[in-house]
Amino acid sequence: ISGPWSDFFRALGAVILYLMTSIVVLVERGNNSKGAAGVLGLCAAGLFGYDAYITFPSGTRRHTAAPTDPADGPVR
């Protein structure tokens, strides 16, 4: 398991869980603390979404191959 992919799926799973929980809390009518918890959960989901966004491209970048020919001509 590669590091960037596992970090991406960790952040993606957190986004899904926070979104589901926050939407359920916001849909239920209750006191103001439930509303605040739902809004803070949506903010946390946004932060985890941003983390997933910046993590995914860093794992897909490729490095250029190192040159194999000597720079000053063939070796004798």
Curated annotation (Swiss-Prot):
Which residues does the UniProt record annotate as the domain MARVEL?
A: 1-60
Main subcellular localisation: membrane
Q: How does it sit in the membrane?
A: Multi-pass membrane protein
Where exactly are the transmembrane stretches of this chain? 8-28, 36-56
Identify the domain of life.
Eukaryota
Entry keywords, A to Z: Glycoprotein, Membrane, Transmembrane, Transmembrane helix
What is the taxonomic lineage of the source species? Eukaryota, Metazoa, Chordata, Craniata, Vertebrata
What name does this protein carry?
Proteolipid protein 2
Q: Function, please?
A: May play a role in cell differentiation in the intestinal epithelium.
> Has the keyword Methyltransferase been applied to this entry?
no
Please give the GO cellular component terms listed in this UniProt entry: membrane
Name of the gene encoding the protein in the UniProt record:
PLP2
Carbohydrate attachment sites?
N31
Indicate where this protein resides in the cell.
Membrane
